[in-house]
Amino acid sequence: MNIYQKTIVTACLCLAALSIQAQTQVIAHRGYWKAEGSAQNSLASLRKAAEAKVYGAEFDVQMTADGIVVVNHDNTIGSTAISRATYEQIKDSKLKNGETLPTLQAYLEEGRKLKDLQLILEIKKNKNKEHEDQAVKTIVKMVKDMGM
């Protein structure tokens, strides 16, 4: 094989590798929560996403007034604003499937067990910039500390 042929083969292999990486992936938004026994952003929805063999599961996080990060899409639980409540005030809140509101710590620990599932974390915005900035720092530190 001459240098010209080697160059063509190498270029084709590189293009093939790039096309594999650029393929569309399926993400379970808030986990696979329409399944029986599941609820949005629940640990069950995370496990069900893995069982469905999707590429990843997106989930939303909010931080309480005392700095505990919880997994929840809305900025309220019932009529309680998560960012104004302490974790103690909301920790027993039930999701539609009966699970209690998961913390980010619990969610990441569960996600770590699901080796083929990518976790896509969305930090929900907060009207209070200082609270939002602290949430970002807390979340990034937790993810790094867990080696994820």
Q: What is each model feature region?
A:
Residues 22-148:
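Phosphate-group recognition and catalysis centered on beta-loop-alpha active-site segments
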Residues 1-24:
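Bacterial Sec-dependent N-terminal signal peptides
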